[in-house]
Swiss-Prot record:
MFS-type transporter; part of the tra gene cluster that produces terrestric acid. The clavatol biosynthesis cluster cla and the terrestric acid cluster tra are both involved in the production of peniphenones and penilactones. Disruption phenotype: Does not result in significant changes in sencondary metabolites production. Belongs to the major facilitator superfamily. CAR1 family. This is MFS-type transporter traF. The keyword Transport applies.
Length: 482
C-alpha cells in the first residue's frame, strides 16, 4: 500500500531537490506498512465518530491555548493600578504570550516528528497550566511577564501539532471540512478571551481568576485528550506495532543534527526562496497582528470613546465571532461543491483553495473601513459593531485558506513552511498591540483604522496573483511537488 509506506518513511526526498540535503526528512525510520488498506490501526480507518471526537479534543486544546493569549487583555487597567506600570507596559502581558507562539513551534514541531503527536502536545499543555499558576499569585510584574512568555511558548504545542493530527486522520476532502471547524476554535479562543476576561476582571473575582480559569480549562480538556485519544502519527503507530510484535527491523535512528538543520535552517531558506510562502506569510502575519491589535483597538473605541464599562465593552467581540462562524460555513460549502468537483476532475487543485481567500481579501478591508468611519460617537453604536462580522469573516477566510494552500503546495515540506509562517505570525501578533495605543491616540480611531485598511488593500492582490499564476510559480520551485 503506497500511501502507508509514504506516511511511515520520513526520509523521503522531494522532487527537484536531490542535491539539497536539507530537502530530506531528518528521521530515518524503517519502512513499515499497514496490514492492508482496511487496517483498523491506521488512524485514517478510525470510525467517523472517533475521528470527530479526536478532532474536537484537539480543537478544544487549541481554543484554550489561544484563549489564554487574550484573556488578560481587559486586565490592563488593574495591572496599571496594582503594580504602578504604564499602559504600554501592561500590554506586554498579551504581547509576550503571543511572542511565545513564535518560539514554541520551533520546539514542538521537531518533537512531534520524533515522539508523535500525543506526548509533546500533552507536555506542552500541562506546562502551560503549571506556568499559569505563578501569574495567578504574582506579587510583581516581572513574574507575570516571564511566565506569560513561557505560557505562550508551551501553549504553542497544540498550534504546532494539532494540524498534523488532523492530516493523520482525514483524507484531503474531508480534512478541508474538519480543518474549517477546527479553525473556528483557533479564532474563537482569542476572540472569546477578552469577552470572558472583561466580565471576570470586572467581577469580585478580579484579574487573577482569568488565569485560574485557564488552568482549570486546560487541565480538564488535557485529561480528556490524554485518557481517550490515541496516538495518530503513522510512523510512530507503525513502529510501536512492529515493536510489540517483535517485528521491528533495524535502522530506526534519529539524526538530531539533521533534525536541527531541517527545522532551524530550511524554513528560513524556503521563506527567502519561495515567493508563494513569502507573500502568504506576510499577508497572514498582517492578519494575525491585526487580530491582536483589535484587543487594544476595540476597548479604545467602545470603552474610552463611547464610555462603556469593561464588561459591556467586550461584547462587540461577539461580532467577530459571528463573522468567524460565517467564514467556516463558506469554506464548508466551497469544499463540498466547487472544491469537490475540481478534485474529481483534476485530482490536485491547490489554487482552488484561494477562492474563499479572495472573498476574504475583499471583506476584510471593507470591515476595517466600515469600523473606522462609524466610530464617531455621534453615530449609533450598532453599525460599528456590525463591521466586526466582516472583519471576522475576512480573517478566517484569509488565514485558513492561506494555511490550506501552503499545505497543498508544499506537502511533506509543509512542516517547515508552517513553522516559519507561525514564527513570523507570532512576531507580528506580539508587535502590533504595542503600537496600538500610540497610533489610536495620535491619529484617532477613524484614521488609525483607515491606515490599517489601506495596508490591507495593498495585500488584496496576493490571492488573485497566485490563483492566476500559482501553478506556473510552483514549477519554478524545488520545494514543491508540481
Amino acid at each position: 500500500m503506497t500511501s502507508g509506506t509514504e506516511q511511515a518513511t520520513l526520509n523521503t526526498e522531494e522532487n527537484g531537490s536531490d542535491s539539497d540535503h536539507l530537502s530530506k526528512e531528518p528521521i530515518a525510520m524503517p519502512a513499515l506498512d499497514w496490514d492492508g488498506p482496511t487496517d483498523s490501526n491506521n488512524p485514517r480507518n478510525f470510525s467517523t465518530p472517533k475521528k470527530v471526537f479526536i478532532t474536537a479534543c484537539l480543537a478544544s486544546l487549541v481554543c484554550i491555548s489561544t484563549f489564554g493569549s487574550s484573556v488578560m487583555s481587559p486586565a490592563s487597567g488593574q495591572l496599571i493600578h496594582e503594580f504602578g506600570i504604564s499602559k504600554e507596559l501592561s500590554i506586554l502581558a498579551t504581547a509576550l504570550y503571543v511572542l511565545g507562539f513564535a518560539v514554541g513551534p520551533l520546539l514542538f514541531g521537531p518533537a512531534s516528528e520524533v515522539l508523535g503527536r500525543k506526548y509533546p502536545l500533552s507536555v506542552g499543555v500541562f506546562l502551560f497550566a503549571i506556568f499559569s499558576i505563578p501569574i495567578a499569585v504574582a506579587k510583581n510584574v516581572a513574574t507575570i511577564f516571564v511566565c506569560r512568555f513561557l505560557c505562550g511558548t508551551f501553549a504553542a504545542a497544540p498550534l504546532a501539532i494539532a494540524g498534523g493530527g488532523l492530516a493523520d486522520l482525514w483524507e484531503p476532502l474531508s480534512r478541508g471540512i474538519a480543518v474549517a471547524g477546527f479553525a473556528s476554535a483557533t479564532f474563537l479562543g482569542p476572540v472569546l478571551g477578552p469577552l470572558v476576561g472583561g466580565f471576570v476582571t470586572k467581577s469580585h473575582l478580579g484579574w487573577r481568576w482569568t488565569q485560574w480559569l485557564s488552568i482549570i480549562f486546560s487541565l480538564v480538556f488535557l485529561a480528556i485528550y490524554f485518557v481517550f485519544c490515541p496516538e495518530t502519527y503513522s510512523p510512530i503507530v507503525l513502529a510501536r506495532l512492529a515493536k510489540k510484535r517483535g517485528q521491528m527491523p533495524p535502522g530506526g535512528k534519529v539524526d538530531f543534527k539533521q533534525l536541527a538543520k531541517v527545522y532551524m535552517l530550511r524554513p528560513f531558506i524556503m521563506l527567502v526562496q519561495e515567493p508563494i510562502l513569502a507573500l502568504l506569510t506576510l499577508y497572514m502575519g498582517f492578519i494575525y497582528g491585526f487580530l491582536y491589535l483589535c484587543f487594544e483597538a476595540f476597548p479604545i473605541a467602545f470603552e474610552e470613546h463611547r464610555g462603556w464599562d469593561i464588561g459591556i465593552g467586550s461584547l462587540p467581540f461577539l461580532s467577530i465571532t459571528v463573522g468567524v462562524l460565517i467564514g467556516v460555513v463558506i469554506i464548508i460549502v466551497h469544499t463540498m461543491t466547487r472544491m469537490r468537483r475540481k478534485l474529481e476532475t483534476v485530482g490536485d487543485a491547490p489554487e482552488e483553495r484561494l477562492v474563499p481567500m479572495m472573498i476574504g481579501s475583499i471583506l476584510m478591508p471593507a470591515g476595517i473601513f466600515w469600523f473606522a468611519w462609524t466610530s464617531n460617537t455621534s453615530l449609533p453604536w450598532a453599525p460599528q459593531v456590525v463591521s466586526g462580522v466582516f472583519i471576522g469573516c475576512g480573517i478566517l477566510l484569509i488565514f485558513l485558506q492561506g494555511m490550506n494552500y501552503i499545505i497543498d503546495v508544499y506537502k511533506v515540506m509543509a512542516n517547515s513552511a508552517i513553522s516559519i509562517n507561525a514564527m513570523f505570525r507570532g512576531l507580528l501578533g506580539a508587535g502590533f498591540p504595542l503600537f496600538a495605543s500610540y497610533m489610536f491616540d495620535n491619529l484617532g480611531v477613524p484614521w488609525a483604522m483607515s491606515l490599517l485598511g489601506f495596508l490591507c488593500v495593498a495585500l488584496v492582490p496576493v490571492p488573485f496573483l497566485f490563483f492566476i499564476y500559482g501553478e506556473r510559480i510552483r514549477k519554478w520551485s524545488k520545494f514543491t511537488a508540481h
